[in-house]
Amino acid sequence: QWMGANGGLINRKDLASYKAKRREPVRTIYRGHEIVGFPPPSSGGVHVAQILNILEPFDLALMAPDSAEFVHLVTEAMRLAFADRAHWLGDADFAAVPKGLASKKYARRLAKKIDPTKAAPVDAHSTPSNAGTDLFGKHTTHFSTADTEGWWVTCTATVNTTFGSGVVIPGTGIVMNNEMDDFSAQPGAPNVFGLIGAEANAIAPGKRPLSSMSPTIVLRDGKPIFTVGAAGGPTIITQVVLAIIQVVDFGKSP
């Protein structure tokens, strides 16, 4: 009622028809560690896995983490992944999101594009094998926790930008989000974070917008050893990748 009286478009039917969905996580193996992340419409699971897969052929442990060599290599891998994000990623219930984006074979192809001596142009996205058939069916908070019974939780929640839409429905204390900005208003038009999207993330009824949330669990020998997530819009993906590298490649404690 309040939304209708104040120019909003959301009605009771919209709220009643919204259902939380259980989805299969994105999984990859990075140097003997199983990386388990969230699938589309979050781009985090796909591209955390993709970036780590691109970097796996390189022996990062031999590099200083603050060296130009390390920074260049990781940056180039991230650029390749974000080019794919802009083209392919969206709600997999509406868009054809290739599972091959997180495959080892595809990552090896992308890794060969990295020139260790200079930044290479990334003119467009690449295309993984079976892209048409093998598909996936700033004001952010992340927390990770575990209990004595062995349950591990990694959770990211967001209202998108600072204070979301800037609206609090009287009597609720709830800040309404502005997640509509995470859709691509039109192909090639940046959102508030400067991210470019394509038709895969176009607005449609009942569709969920693309996000960068990356709640991740890392396992070794089938047992969880740490969880990781972050806040910060598109930098969530890169922060999570760097945290995993620090633990797996450089031996830092979780």
Q: Which sequence ranges carry the predicted segments?
A:
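Short Gly/Pro-enriched turn/cap motifs at secondary-structure boundaries
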Residues: 41-42, 131-136, 201-210
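Internal maturation/activation junctions in enzymes
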Residues: 8, 57-159, 171-172, 179, ...
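Short, well-ordered beta-strand elements
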Residues: 34-40, 47-51, 143, 152-156, ...
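Alpha-helical support elements that line or immediately flank enzyme active sites
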Residues: 1, 53, 230-252
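Short, small/polar residue-rich loop motifs at catalytic or cofactor-binding pockets
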Residues: 22, 137-140, 162, 211-213
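Active-site rim segments in enzyme catalytic domains, especially the processed small/beta chain
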Residues: 9-11, 151-220, 226, 237, ...
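Long, well-ordered, tryptophan-enriched scaffold segments
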Residues: 1-39, 60
